[in-house]
């Protein structure tokens, strides 16, 4: 099924996404030299150039989901040099055939329908890139691991608690079976974000006070009238307007900054409360348009998060967050200036083109992990934690209640989709 990603790394028009996250924040007010400059050891250092990995063999890659992002990922895998696209699968037969032509895939290995991915897994692939509609990710990823096939998985990895838990179990099983399972988040791979995370976790901010984050989708997702089946909603970006298919905006888009915050701070919420509303006229899908969530961490630290999916010319920096300590503040974002200001561990860096460079790093890491036998699969557990955090916020805001993580897990609520009338 086509996957037109909700990340700022959306495949077909990356620059349009970037317009909403580009640029560094301008400094305001006069600051003394002492407040601007850190000790030599605290100044930002240029990231060392990555050592080129040796391409020891070509891996046969299967592409599940042939939308814009899927095609883009397959192209970057080919550009890397360690992969050849061996098979493709998409719900829509015409899409599978067309993309198969573009990628030079034998016609016998172009599969369609809901179960097309199963035939792909039997076609001789060694690895899969799953870029489909998120509702199907847990089932597809688990099937790949069961088949001994390495998994490169897009976000969001799941839309509900049972699916998220299944992803975690699949990651653990993959490690046991010497199978690589990598979740494609870009922000935590950036050298500046890694450095800020190291300093924050080392106490750079002092005792934590509060956290604030923003996740504004770059537009209101398309939401045409419903048909007799959901087939039409499995293409373009329409699935983003259906919570069961996408997880809602806080899960499908905001997860970038939520995951980034978990990576930087190493902290997880234990409860949340919030409010959400749908304000677009004549909604067809059930996604929310705006929501505000207050997360509570175990030690009482609060984290406020605001999200929206409206085309309204907003001027805030989407996918950004500030982490406020008692002696210093850190600011992180998907693109632009990032820093720690105050205290004794000042740092200023810049996140540049993480949309593409992060994916390239992940593809290289995926290949290296497979060929060098590294199967710790460390990205999976953080993805599970991030998704549970996003789902907790979604549910608390939708229900307008105080909800604990323990209650969310115990409830184990499953989202369902009516697949009646779809091609098997």
Regions found by a protein language model. Give the residues of each.
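Predominantly a Rossmann-like dinucleotide-binding segment in NAD(P)-dependent oxidoreductases
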Residues: 65, 176-182, 187-285, 293-295, ...
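Active-site beta-strand termini and strand-to-loop segments that position acidic
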Residues: 295-299, 325
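N-terminal Rossmann-like dinucleotide-binding module
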Residues: 27, 31-103
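A structured beta-alpha segment of the ubiquitous adenosine-cofactor-binding alpha/beta core
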Residues: 109-126, 130
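N-terminal secretory signal peptides
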Residues: 1-15
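Beta-strand-loop-alpha-helix segment that lines the small-molecule cofactor/substrate pocket
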Residues: 126-127, 133, 138-188, 203
